[in-house]
Regions:
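Hydrophobic pocket-lining residues within nucleotide cofactor-binding pockets
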Residues: 38
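Glycine- and charge-enriched low-complexity intrinsically disordered segments
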Residues: 112-130
Length: 141
């Protein structure tokens, strides 16, 4: 049996976040994650060096562009490549643009669950190795 080939964009929206600047960081507020925090979330580890943006900034972004919601997937795209995180129901955070690829608005919730588990496979990691760029700091774009 031969299966049709489709692009990931036919299943989900592939995007990233809006730019957050250092002067947007605050002492308390909504967690702001970079790639290393996404890796920690993937491992269910504690984030010790937490960054934050204000609730006002977060809700402004949420109203205009959307924020990660349950079932979305973030994949690290700089440094340690290809680590997926499946956003949970109680997650409230934003993330650094360029550090993660954001898969959202799947055609069904099962699509993201399937993709998440596929991203954990050696097959996916082999695909990433074939498209990564950079010598000292690996990246996918």
């Amino acid at each position: 049996m031969e299966y049709p080939k489709i692009t990931i964009e036919e299943l989900v929206d592939v995007t990233s976040s809006k730019r957050i600047f250092m002067n947007d960081y605050v002492d308390n507020g909504v967690p702001f994650y970079r790639g290393k925090e996404i890796i920690l979330k993937n491992k269910n580890d504690i984030i010790k060096e937490q960054l934050y943006i204000s609730e006002n900034k977060f809700y402004e972004i949420k109203q205009k562009y959307g924020t990660p919601k349950e079932g979305d997937i973030l994949i690290t795209a700089v440094g340690t490549l290809g680590v997926p995180y499946l956003v949970k129901n109680d997650d409230v955070f934003y993330f650094k643009d360029g550090n993660c690829i954001w898969l959202r608005n799947p055609i069904t919730i099962l699509v993201n669950q399937f993709l998440y588990f596929f991203f954990l496979t050696d097959t996916f990691n082999g695909i990433l190795r074939s498209i990564e760029i950079g010598a000292s700091q690996k990246a996918i774009t």
